[in-house]
A protein has these predicted regions:
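Short, well-formed alpha-helical segments that are part of the catalytic scaffolds
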Residues: 11-26
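A conserved acidic beta->alpha catalytic loop
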Residues: 37-46, 97
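Short beta-strand/loop segment that forms part of the nucleotide-sugar
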Residues: 7, 30-40, 62-64
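Short beta-strand-to-loop acidic/aromatic patch adjacent to the donor-nucleotide binding site
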Residues: 86-98
């Protein structure tokens, strides 16, 4: 059984470390890479196909024709990987490799060893090693974190780290429905887990694991306007999950509605 890794990409032509990705997948047959092109306007798609040509059986490409945000890209990748019966675990990581492969493999090892449903990286948990981040970004992150803690009501230090891995069984619950937010979908992931498992049980089924290394790479896709709007967007998420979306969904319902991407989604797949 394999672990599928989703790598969402938007205008990553000049930032993708193609050599690192190809080397990793050629050396790790127990993994499968799923790159999701989120309507890039540069030559990202061509770069992805060049990588696939070097490892055609171990790399897949999901091409979202219109830029729709990281949430949609990750969800599209999850739906595709779930259709592959040999995939036992599905995770995602950032295209800039701000979290490296060593840390991601450690997340997978913990998921298997502790039989958890979700294991996710943390840049804030005690024990983290070489974490590099500029001062203003660090201050703003702490500010946003307080809003998120209020919304979740769970003792999670870092919801927004771009490295998470899920047991196959929980994937339909997390990714069945489209996310409300384009970028803050990590918060929605934990809200969905909390609603499905209950506040009393969710923390025993998930693990927050310190990263040994995480580096903020410049040229972020989130601008100043996005940052200013974050508190309002978080409030919008809270309203949707606590006032509007109050329906309890079972695992059977989620699995029944969790279908492979189709032509109606304006998505092309190179398996």
């Amino acid at each position: 059984m394999k672990t599928g890794i989703i790598i969402p990409c938007y205008n990553e032509e000049k930032r993708l470390n193609t050599k690192a990705f190809v080397s990793f997948i050629q050396e790790h047959s127990e993994y499968h890479l799923c790159f999701v092109n989120d309507g890039s306007k540069d030559n990202t798609l061509e770069v992805l196909y060049d990588m696939k040509a070097q490892a055609p059986q171990a790399i897949s490409i999901v091409d979202v024709k219109k830029n729709s945000g990281k949430a949609t890209a990750v969800r599209a990748g999850a739906r595709f990987l779930f259709s592959m019966p040999e995939i036992a675990h599905i995770g995602f990581m950032d295209a800039d490799l701000s979290t490296d492969f060593r840390d991601f493999k450690d997340l997978v090892k913990t998921l298997k060893r502790e039989n958890k449903l979700v294991v996710f990286g943390s840049r804030n948990a005690q024990g983290s090693g070489a974490i590099e981040r500029n001062f203003m970004r660090n201050v703003f992150s702490k500010f946003v974190k307080q809003f998120i803690l209020l919304i979740l009501g769970l003792p999670i230090r870092d919801t927004q780290c771009g490295a998470k891995v899920f047991s196959r069984s929980i994937v339909p619950v997390v990714y069945e429905e489209a996310f409300v937010s384009r970028w803050l979908f990590d918060v929605e992931i934990f809200l969905r887990l909390k609603k499905f498992m209950g506040a009393a049980n969710v923390m025993s089924n998930i693990t927050e694991q310190p990263l040994m290394r995480w580096v903020h790479v410049e040229d972020s896709k989130l601008g100043m306007r996005d940052a200013i709007e974050i508190p309002g967007r978080l409030a919008h998420i809270w309203f949707n999950y606590n006032v509007i979306n109050t329906t309890d969904r079972t695992l059977a319902t989620a699995e029944a509605n969790f279908t492979l991407v189709s032509s109606e989604d304006n998505i092309a797949i190179a398996a």
